[in-house]
């Protein structure tokens, strides 16, 4: 059944589609433009059209699908390769005509376009939403032949036929992102105008009027590009594709009364989800599931906890499942929701990734540069014990723990430096990264001198075991050392960036002298990486590296169970404790360690807990770590943080299972994995790991890190324009010259590893475990009532800390300095003195000495964000204008930088320069139309949106996102840009551009409201005395005053 119309849009003659059909009703019909007869045809269904179309003569098959922009639609691309067509665009190669003169070049370009589409899809949907696209989900059609001018023309349609976007705006921006990523000479072949609000798109089997080029399936294309082989006609249609996966709304701001949905709730999960409805079901009954939403029908009036009022008519209740969390929503309030709880069996990212590892759909081994060495420079094998080490100038050994690396090292020393060897009198230096590791090594090499057991000059001892921080006790001599041993070499390199060195410069200098000049160097590590290769290649490049690698998988019998759910992890832990199992719990979070200790003590007061952290006394660490066999043999539960790593090993088979809790806010993946091996033998060989990590956006390559680092220092030498925040180089100071020293290169390598861990903590952790040969599984478990108790204890611990600090002794600067020195030198400090020192630092930070403080004060003002905002506000309000403040800060940091480069380069690299972050934050604020952080003016919605579009479409925000470690926003969406700007302003100043009743103004965040700008010091609370001159209100909006005035307190 069909109806015909002369026009699509309404007109006075009543002959248009819109005269009879509303946009809403057109959703359920199929609209076709008949080019041959110059008509629009409305069919009841697609099937009706296909049946009618089959009966039409070939020359009249000029049909185009009418795609309405407001409807969901497939992503599509129209590719044209005309012959002998001139292009006036300067960006196009002069030889563009020749590009399409043979099929091979056409196919090369087409393949390039498909690859870019897949790359943009991966960045937009796969990474954040885990929605994948393969070539088999891409459909290619062609229409090759002569056009109306009798010229040969290649034309292709690329359709992502298994996915759809919400509307034409989503499709339009996705297409623009593809175009941005195409090479300039390819850009003209892609039509950017195929996503209009009403779009005609040729239907399969049709041709344009006057041309015999028919759009058709092409098996050859599918074979060449490995794309879909479907010949189902409906797969080529664009509009209302019900059988597709609807992609998340990314680029446009669409208001909906129903929260967005994504993954479909499985039937196995529905029963558990419905349990969260609880008492809500007294007034509602289950209606149906729509993707990740559970919809309910109202049976009687009820009170809504979200709206805080009664609802008595419509069906307002919705439960949404995101990840493993269940949220309550109300259709009347789309801005707020209530967290109901967590599902025990819902797979989150960790579980999904483990599942992919289990099915071997992911390559877990990360190749390193040593593996690429030529065969004569490698010895690779797979045996349960180590083979003899080679006598070569630079030997690098990689093997898992407990395969015999140290045993073979002893054999090496005996063979080449024993009593019967010609080298027995030669100098050997064995460098370690921890004091306890040094003692551990000496117990296995008794003929070596331990640096901590002798005083004075160490050069007179031929064989010395020495920790990194004490290398300054050695001196360079005319003769190089014969053998330098670097056990746990990656950790040694890490230690140079620890900030714990009292005499960094001489220690690093002697290390580099030995590394560059030693006759022989042996590096050993189970977690060997590219950092070691790059450092050796750079500083021992004159001698070849030899790679000795035993690939034996000693961990092949170990079983690792992963989860992202703290609740699942805790329930498993509680179950094992109830079964009286002895547990090892490593974690890289001090708060989590303390929380677990308190939680277990309350649940199981009879159990003995061993607890070690950075807060443990120096005496306890030294005595216990030197005799772990005794002390750990006394406990039922062992909890520790990264204060225990390599060098501490418990060999007895006492503990049953290990529970690890790790996140990406602390040490890197390699250190976390090392922590798992401190107890060498578990009875069950079972490891249960909870991994948590927020998304980070740190620069990951050496090139990006170097660019970011030098850029921060580069801006210190530039002159600021008062009007546009543009820069020129200062004639007096000139451009900076950077000396790339050995430490600089080591620092870059270390930053790269840290950033990789922060950005990809979960995947790298699981990969490294799986690469050892261990079996990996998803951790599941019964649901128990533990989370509320756990959270309650966490709040108790935090509150007690606040109480302890607030009630601690008020000490003066002299005592504070003494405590600081004792802590730095490892001298035990009394717990009460530690709280007093924390109190002193808090009062000193805000210049709040002489005031009595409460636990609430400590909670609010000792937070990282409040302190960061306070510092930012102080720095930006020192001058009469923000530009004057910026110049003052720039001068201060430039002076430090120049001093550091002359005296202590490591201080420069470890210093957190803040000028550039202020410069970017103020730049964003001014581009929005505000003059400074205290601007009281108000912008209308139209004014701000226009600014966001005009100012940011052409502005590259990469440097800003690097600076603040934020994801770069989509520049085509003003609301996304505003969210990005508010994150920056919130991090730097505790401010945001707030929206209220169609107007925008600067307002404090929660942290910012604690530290108001004032003209003169006030007594009520810490504040920022601002020198910024007041700004005159110029807004046309007179009836409303910006709340920024509330933050500027007069006395």
From Swiss-Prot:
Family (UniProt): Belongs to the asfivirus F1055L family.
Induction remark: Expressed in the early phase of the viral replicative cycle.
Phylogenetic placement of the source organism: Viruses, Varidnaviria, Bamfordvirae, Nucleocytoviricota, Pokkesviricetes
Single biological process term from Gene Ontology: DNA replication
Name of this chain's protein: Putative helicase/primase complex protein
Molecular function per GO: ATP binding; DNA replication origin binding
Job description of the protein: May be involved in DNA replication.
Organism: African swine fever virus (isolate Tick/South Africa/Pretoriuskop Pr4/1996)
Keywords: DNA replication, Early protein
TM spans (from-to): none
């Amino acid at each position: 059944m069909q109806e015909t119309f002369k026009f699509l849009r309404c007109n006075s003659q009543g002959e248009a589609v819109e005269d009879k059909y509303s946009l809403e009703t057109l959703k359920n019909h199929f609209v076709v433009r008949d080019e041959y007869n110059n008509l629009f045809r409305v069919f009841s269904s697609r099937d009706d059209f296909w049946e009618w179309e089959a009966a039409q003569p070939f020359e009249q098959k000029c049909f185009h699908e009418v795609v309405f922009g407001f409807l969901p639609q497939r992503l599509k691309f129209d590719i044209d390769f005309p012959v002998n067509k001139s292009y006036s665009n300067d960006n196009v190669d002069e030889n563009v005509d020749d590009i399409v003169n043979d099929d091979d070049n056409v196919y090369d370009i087409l393949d390039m376009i498909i690859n870019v589409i897949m790359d943009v899809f991966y960045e937009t949907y796969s990474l954040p939403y885990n929605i994948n696209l393969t070539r088999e989900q891409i459909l290619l059609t062609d229409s090759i032949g002569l056009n109306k001018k009798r010229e040969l023309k290649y034309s292709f349609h690329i359709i992502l036929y298994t996915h759809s976007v919400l509307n034409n705006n989503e499709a339009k921006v996705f297409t623009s992102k593809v175009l941005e990523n195409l090479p300039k000479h390819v850009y003209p072949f892609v039509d950017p105008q195929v996503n209009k609000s009403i779009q005609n798109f040729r239907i399969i089997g049709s041709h344009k009027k006057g041309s015999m080029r028919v759009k058709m399936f092409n098996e050859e294309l599918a074979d060449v590009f490995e794309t879909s082989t479907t010949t189902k006609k409906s797969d080529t249609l664009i509009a209302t594709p019900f059988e597709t996966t609807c992609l998340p709304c990314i680029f446009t701001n669409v208001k909906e009364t129903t929260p967005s949905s994504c993954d479909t709730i499985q039937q196995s999960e529905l029963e558990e989800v419905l349990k969260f409805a609880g008492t809500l079901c007294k007034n509602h009954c289950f209606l149906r599931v729509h993707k990740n939403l559970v919809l309910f029908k109202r049976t009687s009036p009820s009170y809504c906890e979200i709206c805080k009022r009664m609802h008595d008519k419509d069906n307002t209740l919705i439960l949404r499942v995101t990840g493993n969390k269940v949220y309550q929503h109300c259709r009347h309030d789309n801005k707020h929701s209530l967290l109901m709880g967590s599902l025990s069996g819902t797979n989150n990212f960790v579980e999904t990734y483990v599942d992919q590892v289990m099915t071997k759909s992911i390559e877990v081994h990360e190749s390193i540069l040593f593996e690429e060495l030529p065969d004569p420079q490698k010895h690779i094998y797979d045996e349960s014990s180590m083979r003899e080490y080679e006598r070569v100038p630079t030997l690098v050994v990689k093997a898992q723990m407990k395969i015999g690396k140290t045993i073979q090292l002893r054999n090496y020393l005996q063979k080449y430096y024993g009593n019967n060897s010609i080298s027995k009198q030669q100098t050997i230096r064995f460098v370690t990264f921890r004091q306890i590791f040094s003692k551990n090594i000496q117990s296995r090499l008794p003929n070596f001198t331990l640096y901590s057991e002798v005083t004075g000059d160490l050069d007179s001892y031929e064989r010395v075991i020495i920790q990194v921080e004490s290398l300054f006790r050695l001196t360079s001599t005319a003769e190089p050392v014969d053998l330098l041993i670097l056990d746990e070499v990656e950790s040694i390199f890490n230690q140079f960036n620890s900030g714990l060195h009292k005499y960094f410069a001489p220690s690093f200098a002697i290390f580099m002298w030995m590394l560059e000049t030693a006759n022989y160097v042996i590096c050993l590590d189970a977690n060997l990486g590219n950092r070691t290769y790059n450092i050796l290649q750079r500083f021992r490049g004159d001698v070849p590296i030899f790679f000795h690698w035993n690939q034996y998988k000693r961990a092949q019998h170990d079983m690792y169970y992963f989860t992202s759910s703290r609740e699942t992890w805790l329930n498993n832990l509680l179950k094992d404790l109830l079964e009286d199992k002895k547990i090892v719990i490593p974690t890289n979070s001090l708060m989590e360690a303390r929380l677990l200790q308190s939680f277990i003590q309350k649940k199981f007061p009879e159990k003995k807990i061993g607890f070690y952290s950075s807060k443990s006394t120096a005496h306890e660490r030294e005595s216990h770590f030197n005799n772990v066999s005794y002390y750990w043999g006394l406990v039922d539960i062992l909890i520790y943080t990264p204060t225990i790593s390599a060098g501490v090993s418990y060999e007895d088979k006492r503990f049953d299972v290990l529970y690890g809790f790790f996140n990406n806010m602390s040490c890197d993946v390699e250190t976390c994995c090392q922590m798992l091996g401190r107890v060498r033998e578990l009875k069950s060989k079972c490891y249960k790991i909870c991994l948590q990590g927020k998304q980070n956006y740190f620069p990951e390559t050496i090139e990006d890190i170097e660019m970011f680092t030098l850029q921060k220092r580069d801006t210190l030498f530039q002159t600021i324009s008062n009007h546009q925040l543009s820069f020129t180089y200062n004639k007096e100071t000139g451009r900076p010259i950077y000396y790339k020293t050995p430490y600089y290169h080591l620092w870059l390598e270390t930053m790269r590893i840290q950033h990789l861990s922060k950005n990809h903590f979960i995947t790298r952790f699981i990969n490294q475990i799986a690469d050892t040969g261990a079996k990996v599984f998803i951790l599941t478990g019964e649901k128990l009532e533990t989370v509320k108790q756990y959270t309650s204890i966490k709040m108790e611990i935090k509150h007690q800390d606040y109480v302890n600090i607030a009630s601690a002794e008020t000490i003066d600067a002299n005592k504070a300095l003494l405590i600081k020195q004792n802590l730095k030198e490892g001298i035990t400090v009394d717990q009460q003195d530690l709280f007093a020192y924390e109190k002193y630092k808090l009062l000193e930070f805000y210049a709040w000495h002489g005031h009595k403080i409460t636990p609430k004060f400590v909670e609010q003002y000792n937070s990282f964000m409040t302190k960061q905002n306070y510092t930012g506000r102080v720095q930006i309000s020192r001058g009469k204008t923000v530009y004057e403040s910026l110049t003052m800060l720039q001068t201060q940091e430039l002076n430090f930088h120049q001093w550091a480069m002359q005296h202590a380069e490591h201080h420069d690299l470890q210093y957190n320069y803040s000028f550039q972050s202020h410069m970017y934050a103020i730049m964003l604020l001014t581009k929005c139309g505000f003059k400074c952080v205290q601007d009281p003016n108000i912008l209308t919605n139209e004014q701000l949106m226009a600014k966001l579009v005009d100012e940011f479409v052409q502005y590259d925000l990469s440097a800003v996102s690097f600076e603040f470690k934020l994801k770069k926003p989509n520049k085509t969406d003003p609301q996304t840009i505003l969210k990005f700007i508010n994150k920056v302003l919130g991090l730097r100043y505790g401010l945001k551009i707030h929206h209220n009743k169609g107007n925008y103004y600067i307002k404090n965040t929660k942290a910012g409201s604690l530290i108001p700008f004032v003209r003169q010091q006030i007594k009520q609370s810490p504040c920022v005395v601002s020198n910024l001159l007041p700004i005159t209100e110029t807004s046309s909006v007179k009836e409303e005053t910006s709340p920024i005035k509330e933050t500027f307190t007069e006395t």
